[in-house]
Curated annotation (Swiss-Prot):
Membrane topology: Multi-pass membrane protein
Name of the featured protein: Cytochrome c oxidase subunit 3
TM regions (residue ranges): 16-34, 41-66, 73-105, 129-152, 156-183, 191-223, 233-256
Its EC number(s): 7.1.1.9
The keyword Mitochondrion is annotated on this UniProt entry: yes
Purpose: Component of the cytochrome c oxidase, the last enzyme in the mitochondrial electron transport chain which drives oxidative phosphorylation. The respiratory chain contains 3 multisubunit complexes succinate dehydrogenase (complex II, CII), ubiquinol-cytochrome c oxidoreductase (cytochrome b-c1 complex, complex III, CIII) and cytochrome c oxidase (complex IV, CIV), that cooperate to transfer electrons derived from NADH and succinate to molecular oxygen, creating an electrochemical gradient over the inner membrane that drives transmembrane transport and the ATP synthase.
High-level lineage: Eukaryota, Metazoa, Chordata, Craniata, Vertebrata
Residues in the Mitochondrial matrix compartment per record: 1-15, 67-72, 153-155, 224-232
The species this protein was found in: Sus scrofa (Pig)
Length: 261
């Protein structure tokens, strides 16, 4: 290995971006196969390869940061910029869904009956499960902040407790969302209302699952004493992501569930 005279981490060649891209291709193709041909084989293969990629990529990053000390303050600064840019790209991603929703709802076409919700659609009551889900995510935002403050103060017990509560609330949100989908009186194929509703809330639900997984990894790392008050970017990134998921849900609730109903 050549002598390094800078603070940057020169990453070794890794197969995980390639396997991650392959798993994304398998999952999206598998989702199409499931929708149109009721076959979950390709989707299951995609989920399996995605899970393996996540495990091995996280393992490598934990090794590089915690055990090899490659994540210097300069590297962490770069990672912070990367996470900020990623969240900005996610904001633009959801902007597209809100644009589609408002484009359809503010000037409904004659095919929709000239009204919103379209003729024949019975929207969900925003004061039932959606309101409960809103309170759950707001509570999880409080608990993740509690976890962050506990970590900064070196309070290991409260950090683990708060992080566990956040993950439990995330799982509870996902279960409630799944039950809401199961009982919804309309489907994804019920015109523009069904498609915008399920795609927007479905992608948000996917982000909650990803965020819960991210936080679960952070909990395991905290149990193994990986985080300190000045070296915990993995948790910080997960907390930023979780707050982003919270804010997106508030916009979804106000726009699609409350105003859109």
């Amino acid at each position: 290995m050549t002598h390094q005279t800078h603070a940057y981490h020169m990453v070794n060649p890794s197969p995980w971006p390639l396997t991650g891209a392959l798993s994304a291709l398998l999952m999206t193709s598998g989702l199409t196969m499931w929708f149109h041909f009721n076959s979950m084989l390709l989707l299951s293969l995609g989920l399996l390869t995605n899970t393996l990629t996540m495990y091995q990529w996280w393992r490598d990053i934990i090794r590089e940061s915690t055990f090899q000390g490659h994540h210097t303050s300069v590297v962490q600064k770069g990672l912070r910029y990367g996470m900020i840019l990623f969240i900005i790209s996610e904001v633009l991603f959801f902007t597209g869904f809100f644009w589609a929703f408002y484009h359809s709802s503010l000037a409904p076409t004659p095919e929709l009956g000239g009204c919103w919700p379209p003729t024949g659609i019975h929207p969900l009551n925003p004061l039932e499960v959606p309101l409960l889900n809103t309170s759950i995510l707001l509570a999880s935002g409080v608990s993740i902040t509690w976890a962050h403050h506990s970590l900064m103060e070196g309070d290991r017990k409260h950090m683990i407790q708060a992080l566990s509560i956040t993950i439990a609330l995330g799982v509870y949100f996902t279960l409630l969302q799944a039950s809401e989908y199961y009982e919804a009186p309309f489907t994804i194929s019920d015109g523009v209302y069904g498609s915008t509703f399920f795609v927007a809330t479905g992608f948000h639900g996917l982000h909650v699952i990803i965020g819960s997984t991210f936080l679960a990894v952070c909990l395991l790392r905290q149990l193994k004493f990986h985080f300190t008050s000045n070296h915990h970017f993995g948790f910080e990134a997960a907390a930023w992501y979780w707050h982003f998921v919270d804010v997106v849900w508030l916009f979804l609730y106000v726009s699609i569930y409350w105003w859109g109903s």
